[in-house]
Amino acid sequence: MVHYKSVFYKSAALVCGFVLAGASVAIASSEAAAKTRSKMSEFKRRAVSSPSGGRLSVLDGSFTALANDASFFEANPAGSANMTHSELTFAHTVGFNNSHAETLSYVGQSGNWGYGASMRMFFPESGFNFSPSTGPVCTPASNPIKKLGGLGIVNFSRRFGGLSIGANLKAGFRDAQGLTHLSLGTDVGLQWVGNVAKFFSSAEPNMYVGLSATNLGFTVKLPGSPFVLCRATGEQCCKTCSGRCTGVGTCCNGEKPCCKDCDCNCPCQDEATPGSPHATDTMLRAGFAYRPLSWFLFSVGVATRVNVSNLQVDHSGSALPMRLG
């Protein structure tokens, strides 16, 4: 016998999920399109990051609360202790501008302990290319930045009843058109799971709360030949963009006129000397999820990016960039 009412509810919930996912992707696309100026200058503070997994990509900040599959690593490191099963996964993730990442992850449990490891490589649209440079050194800011890199994560967490505490140790490297950085850092997280106002029978909890701080660490710019290449082919771009362009000539290898705001992607914009560390941009995340019925899940999350060096300089309490998901 077919229970049409149950099928209808499940179908409606699925449609709502697709609508919300589409809205999240649309918002992310508009944000990416709006931030096309001086992108290379921000890379010195970015940790190597390669989120993977369908649930993390769609739920974003709210997955900080759930964190209940192998994509939990960069959402909430406390998730491994509250999982009820082990997972071995391989994920192929395609991002914007056809960039992609390959991820191999394992998570397991032993008593009240959770543990896991994840290895990731990410590539530009050109594919598996391990050449010294991933593309032209100096390009228009409207062009995507080609990135090549790898990331390794080791996770441990401990459960105390419904509360778990976890941490990741992570290391990675990234080459972004000649701007090469090595990143070392850690993630910390807190998760609570339990049963509250539950109207269905299941061994799984129906309420989740999560907090995490990811990418606590530093990046170091590595010396290399791409900067010699940068000075040779991108000299005009770097010099005119670092000052105030008079409008004479072009930059970005002649592809786009130069302006005083430096509308270029050029490694020379990173003024740091090789070997000098920079504090990474830390992501602060919070999430809440509630499942009153077997076919319905409500979740909400928030994430914001901060940098320790900025907080030390600016005490004005200016608004931090924040997103809901």
Curated annotation (Swiss-Prot):
Protein name: UPF0164 protein TP_0856
Record bears the keyword Zinc: no
Signal peptide limits: 1-28
Keyword Signal: yes
Family: Belongs to the UPF0164 family.
UniProt superkingdom: Bacteria
InterPro entries: UPF0164 (IPR005362)
Keywords: Signal
